[in-house]
């Protein structure tokens, strides 16, 4: 990628397409420590995209499995004491083997859950933090308690906090919203594709965290990985909505379109834009 302030959109679109081609070829193994509401949908999203899910979320196996996985997702949507131990163990295993892991801090801002997230971050910094604006604000200590996926803070209000997290953890931060913002220390890209029904189906946002971990497993530039995952899910959401009567059919069509969409269409239709300051 070019230096700060010179993100070439043609090159970026090509890198997104190439990343999807590589994902489908290499079939990265993704360990998912995710919430009980979305586990099945998340696994199907990964399979249809071309990755291999492994829902290994117990403390006895998590650390060892993270060391052999290509990418790891830690999602705090429904934390229990045993699974929180597994999350910390997975972060430790990922760090010891340089496996990229993605944090999706669902509901951060509630006291115990925030402590779990911070304890996990103390073990190892993630490759990517994927969250909504309210979660970014809460994680940075600049917002109130989170309502999780239903939180209503504007993405633009969380950009300063996202920059703070980027600097503190040395990671990429991807903020989901009507327009997604993805930034690291040098670059800031937006993705403006997608469809409103993405918020009407349980698990779409959580599956984006898993998809980001899959791309991070095959793409060393983690900003490109996050942009690729976001663009892919948003483009297939548009395609799925075009042939669906409502959210139920949309959820099924979304899984189909992840399998059917071409890499070039993801790169070209993603609505990518450089907004690096």
From Swiss-Prot:
Its cofactor is Mg(2+). ATP binds at residues 130, 176. It comes from the Bacteria. InterPro entries: Hyethyz_kinase, Ribokinase-like. GO terms for biological process: thiamine biosynthetic process; thiamine diphosphate biosynthetic process. Gene3D superfamilies: 3.40.1190.20. Substrate binds at residues 55, 203. Keywords: ATP-binding, Kinase, Magnesium, Metal-binding, Nucleotide-binding, Thiamine biosynthesis, Transferase. Catalyzes the phosphorylation of the hydroxyl group of 4-methyl-5-beta-hydroxyethylthiazole (THZ). This is Hydroxyethylthiazole kinase. It comes from Cutibacterium acnes (strain DSM 16379 / KPA171202).
């Amino acid at each position: 990628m070019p230096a700060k302030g010179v993100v070439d959109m043609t090159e970026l679109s090509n890198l997104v397409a190439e990343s999807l081609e590589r994902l489908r070829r290499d079939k990265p193994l993704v360990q998912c420590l995710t919430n009980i509401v979305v586990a099945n949908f998340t696994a199907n999203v990964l399979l249809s995209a071309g990755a291999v899910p492994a829902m290994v979320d117990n403390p006895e196996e998590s650390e060892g499995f993270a060391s052999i996985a290509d990418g790891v997702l830690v999602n705090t949507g429904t934390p229990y004491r045993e699974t929180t131990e597994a999350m910390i163990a997975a972060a430790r295993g990922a760090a010891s083997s340089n496996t990229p892991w993605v944090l999706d801090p669902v509901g951060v801002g509630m006291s115990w859950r925030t402590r779990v997230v911070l304890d996990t971050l103390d073990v190892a910094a993630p490759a990517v933090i994927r969250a909504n604006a309210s979660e970014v604000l809460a994680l940075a200590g600049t917002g109130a308690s989170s309502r999780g996926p239903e939180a209503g803070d504007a993405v633009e209000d969380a950009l300063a906090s996202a920059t703070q997290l980027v600097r503190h953890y040395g990671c990429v931060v991807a903020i989901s919203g009507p327009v997604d913002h993805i930034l690291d220390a040098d670059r800031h890209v937006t993705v403006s594709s997608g469809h409103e029904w993405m918020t009407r189906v349980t698990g779409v946002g959580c599956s984006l965290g898993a998809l980001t971990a899959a791309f991070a497993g095959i793409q060393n530039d983690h900003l490109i990985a996050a942009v690729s995952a976001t663009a892919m899910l948003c483009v297939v959401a548009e395609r799925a909505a075009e042939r669906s009567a409502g959210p139920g059919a949309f959820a099924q069509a979304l899984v189909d379109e992840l399998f059917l969409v071409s890499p070039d269409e993801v790169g070209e239709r993603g609505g990518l834009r450089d907004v690096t300051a």
